């Protein structure tokens, strides 16, 4: 079973900042998915952290933010992997909506972040399928190359 563990709540937007993809909130969603015995967790790539503090929910110790994570994209994604029982349950990140010319670069960057964080893959549906066949195939092949490249390792 692949479980979409997206955090959705209007309260996750605070002072103009959107925390729907915050590492701490999505990490908790991943943990809940693992607890429900999902075989694979699908999650958005994290874009920030500190959602619990901003929304005034949870009792996360400050050291989680100061010592266990940084704002680096790989560390934020690694926090998601950690909440999947340290990768025992595979994490795949979603590729997001197609934005046009930057899709190839965005998909490769997301794949590198996911792989270096210990994730297991990337779903790039709209980025690949909402374009001409050759372009979509090139995008999928580029993602595959990231995961098959032995020099791209866990950071």
Language-model features: locations:
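Short secondary-structure boundary segments
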Residues: 45, 95-96, 126
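Alpha/beta enzyme core
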Residues: 1-92, 104-120, 145, 149
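C-terminal helical cap(s) of enzyme catalytic domains, especially alpha/beta-barrels
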Residues: 117-118, 129-155
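Proteins with a high burden of low-complexity, intrinsically disordered sequence enriched in S/T/G/P/A and R
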Residues: 1, 125, 153-155
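Short active-site-adjacent structural elements
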Residues: 100-104, 122-124, 130-133
